[in-house]
Amino acid sequence: MENKMKVQITTSNQEHIAGYREISIKDGKIDFQEISDNECTHILANNILDVFPAQQVKLCIMELVKKLRLGGTLVVGGTDLRIFSLNVINGMLQPNEASDIISSVSSMSDTGTIANFIREMNLTIINTQIGGVHYEISAERK
């Protein structure tokens, strides 16, 4: 029987999903001490990219990919800067809503840039979803 390790990377205000091994972000780093490289069949990191400064987002994705086994899937997500900006300019986000979002993130990136980072690491994009200003990208390591 194949060992299926499903991991969820969580922030301090995020609920744990049953059936996933929870890995927390501590001191600005993902605590992967107990996870070997190429061990995970599925990594759910759909709300974490905003936690890292812009200069560390690519490194974060690289760390996630190292833990993913061949055939494994990765889901990453964050706040899309371009969509956020358009929503502010077009009045779809009120100033207080925009301010709340800005104060809750360390950085914002755009979906295209993150998809390119993922492709650079030889993963295949399976799906991209956008809801409001949040995006999620699913990819597979082949």
PLM features per residue range, with description:
Residues 1-35, 73-142:
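Class I (Rossmann-like) S-adenosyl-L-methionine-dependent methyltransferase catalytic domain
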Residues 39-44:
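Hydrophobic beta-strand segment of the Class I
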Residues 53-55:
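Acidic-and-aromatic substrate-binding clefts and catalytic sites of carbohydrate-active enzymes
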Residues 48-51:
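Hydrophobic adenine-recognition pocket in adenosine-nucleotide-binding enzymes
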Residues 58-73:
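A short glycine-rich, Lys/Arg-flanked "PGG" loop and its adjoining helix->strand segment in the class I
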